[in-house]
Regions:
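Chalcogenol-based redox active-site neighborhoods
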Residues: 1-157
């Protein structure tokens, strides 16, 4: 499957959020910019830092007419627990079979403690109101992720 390219339409998806409601990329076309960020696992240290940075920057994202969607292979119940525990104010989507991560090139080989396995490659995709992919960030730093994304949107959208 070809990886998404900047300037092309972002790969479509429809996934369940933490409450079991379907959220589709097309829901935002013509209305809002969309930040899609793939993260490995809810309630782990790096993912918590990243999510809380986004939570704390919600006013900036709102001012930029941008919605943030986090996607992981976690089941819905784990997503809801993560939202409750961290008071997150944006949707997390469940991609248990990693089919959407595959479409975005966000699933692949990783190494941890000397072992190689397949998993989520922490990455972010910025989609404009026109539904086209505007940016791909694949070298994500969890502590500054929210600021990096906001700065990019301010300059480019």
């Amino acid at each position: 499957m070809p990886l998404p390219k900047i300037g092309n339409l972002a790969p479509a998806f429809s996934l369940q959020n933490q409450q079991g409601d379907k959220v589709s990329l097309k829901d935002f076309k013509g209305k809002k910019n969309v930040v899609i960020y793939f993260y490995p696992k809810a309630s782990t240290p790096g993912c918590t830092v990243q999510a809380c940075g986004i939570r704390d920057s919600s006013a900036a994202f709102k001012m930029l007419n941008t919605v943030v969607l986090g996607i992981s292979p976690d089941p819905i119940k784990r997503l809801q627990n993560f939202i409750d525990k961290q008071a997150l104010n944006f949707d997390l989507l469940s991609d248990e079979d990693h089919s959407i991560a595959d479409k975005y090139g966000a699933w692949g080989p990783k190494k941890f403690m000397g072992k190689e396995y397949d998993g989520i490659l922490r990455s972010t995709f910025i989609v404009g109101k026109d539904g086209k992919l505007k940016a791909i960030m694949d070298k994500v730093k969890t502590k500054s992720h929210h600021d990096d994304v906001i700065d990019w949107i301010k300059v480019n959208l």
